[in-house]
């Protein structure tokens, strides 16, 4: 009985640690207005290969003075498997976990409420969105809906929409972890905040 109670308390503690983040959909270039009064941003990109012909894209830029998010750092991510090909077996990625640390909240979609994560579903590339974004400690796990899959021929696979968060910390390199159906989790070079 005591061990059952202990297990129950452990499960409750684990569940209490997981924190769902608020996700909103936005369009480009309108989202840029949160980060620059001119509604234009200059970005830097990092690419990490996935299964030879796919990649994880990390995008980073600093919000400009005079913008709602002035002084913060913007991090956007995208998984591109459009050219990952399978004939009898189509590989896919179900989630991406990044050691992000604390994120800053802003009104990304103009409804007056503060949000955690934005997904650029209009005005940009992609066809796969987010099912959820869940924080556990410093890690955030982004689960895709549906999974991001390769295709039966080049150009027939999926790409996620760009999805992003904001932090008060500048970037450093981290190893992101992508859960998939082809074997052990993929460990991918990415940018994320250099938080304490």
Describe the predicted segments one by one.
Residues 13-15:
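N-terminal signal peptide c-region/cleavage motif recognized by signal peptidases
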Residues 1-4:
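Positively charged n-region of N-terminal signal peptides that target proteins for export
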